Amino acid sequence: MNDVKGVMLFSFTGELLFKEFVSPLSEEPEKKDWWRLFFLSLNKVNEAELVFEKSRLYIRKTELGFLMILMGCFAPVAMVRLNCDILIPALKQTTTMSGLKRFFMKNIL
C-alpha cells in the first residue's frame, strides 16, 4: 500500500514476533523495554490510531498480540483497516507471518 512504512506484530507481553520495514530503522524496535508497559496501558482497546506530525501509527489487537502499522500521512487508512480485517483471521491459521507483507504491495488501480 502507498505510504505504509512498516509492520510489527508484538505479543501481549511486548515480545516482537514479526517486523518488516520499507527501509532500515535507526534503532531496532525490540531494543525498547517499554513495549509491555505500552500494551498494558492499551488494556481493552481493540483499535487505535496515533497521529503525529509526519506519521501515523495504527494499532490493532489480535489473538496473538498487537499489530502495529507505521504509515506516512497519506496512507489510505480505510485500506489498512480492510487489509487488517482480511489478515487477522488468517494469522490464527498460519505459523509464518508472510501474510503481513500484504501491507507493502502496491495498489493496482
Locations of the language-model features?
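Acidic, low-complexity cytosolic segments
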Residues: M1-G6, S11-L109
